[in-house]
Amino acid sequence: MSSTTILDLTATPQEQAPLPALLRNVRRATDAGDDPFMPPGYLQARACFELGPTARGATAVSQKFEVQADEVLVIELADGGVLITSASELQASLARSRPDLLGSQGEILFDRLRADGAATRGLAADLVGGLISRVFALAVGASDDAIISDARAKLGELTRGRGSEAIELGVSWLGTKALMWAIEKRLERQPGIYCWQAVQGAAAAESDEQARARAQRELQAAAAAGEPVLVFVHGTGSSTRGSFGDLQLDERELWSILEREFDGRIYAFEHRTLSESPIENARQLLAALPAGLRLSLVTHSRGGLVGDLICLENFDSLIEHYRSDLPATGETDTAAATVVQRELGDAHGEQRQLLRALASELAEKKPVVQRYVRVASPAQGTRLASGNLDVFLSGLLTLLGQIPFFFGNPLYSACKRVVLEIARRRTSAHLVPGIEAMLPESPMARLLRDAPVRPGIEMAVIAGDIEGGGLL
């Protein structure tokens, strides 16, 4: 594969290329300091091309631009959508679905893509014909920063120092786990159960450790008194306030009912959704729950996989079959596909051990799940994540940018860093622990379909059947 990819386009180049608006540093506080996820120098704009109708006049010129292998493309659409990908990934997608949109030397024919994009499939289909407004080429992470240093150290721990130098971040299961861990560890709240914090008003003056300890005391008291509690479990790349904060603000009457019903015993389970699998999340949640606790669960998106696991019983006989039976990984390169298959085999072996531990802990703790509301869960897998990870994450990032809660929020910056790292490294969705479980071909979907659920749970499911259009 060539180390460069050629963009063939008619556009107006900008002399001093800016960063895309989506990736500019926006902090809520004027004295917030540097962004730990997007530090100075992490992104450098190499080029920006205007392709919209207003730019395709006298100033537009036909040109060819070389994108380096370690650079990222940011493609802005006129409808507000943004795609962050690598030029080589876009080129590979076109080679599979629309080779006529590539030149004789593999160059990407953007003029033809603009005209014919609506008829394409795969990644190119998301660049709806005629809607591309700007294309940026960005140099990403020219030198290691604290996140990369932490990821390499974590990788050494995960491999126990054996051969970690030969493992690349983002192109192996452990390398991707370490990279996602290094990003997620910088989030404001560490994993664990917390007492619900009011969306408005000053935060409690206590550390995460103190807050978790306070929640533990309350949960122990509730279990001893036989009182029910309510636990919220958030979704991918989010937090409890990000997933459920509007419920308290916009549905005040409903929230008052919940507070009365549970006498204020409402809790938030914060967890890592990328570096950890739902099995790891479920074990963390269970570890924080006192034995025999009566609880109700409300989950959103990927959090539904965590909630489902907590509701299982007697699934030991299914654990040995927790492995991928499908040879396809979405990789067009045979060597890359072989690596992904081998990595998945090892990862699923580790997850079988985790499932055995979870089954034992469920039998010991015996949580009493009384009510369970599951919203938009990928219980049988989601093809939104299985087609192309760049598209899925770019769409997620675009959506988060429309939610006021995430404006200037460190969680939003963390998501940007994740999307950029995955794009520049062409990371497979199968190698991201928290996303692999959401793929339709993942053994998680089969386990949740076949495993018995404890009787007596009142369950409500809010679901839909959608097919994405454009980037969203």
Which residues does each predicted region cover?
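Alpha/beta-hydrolase-fold serine-hydrolase catalytic core, especially in secreted/extracellular enzymes
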Residues: 2-10, 16, 297, 349, ...
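A structural motif corresponding to the C-terminal end of an alpha-helix
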Residues: 258-265, 358-371, 447-458
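Conserved beta-strand scaffold positions in the cores of enzyme catalytic domains, especially
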Residues: 230, 266-268, 372-374, 459-461
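Serine-dependent carboxylesterase/thioesterase catalytic core
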Residues: 234-238, 269-434
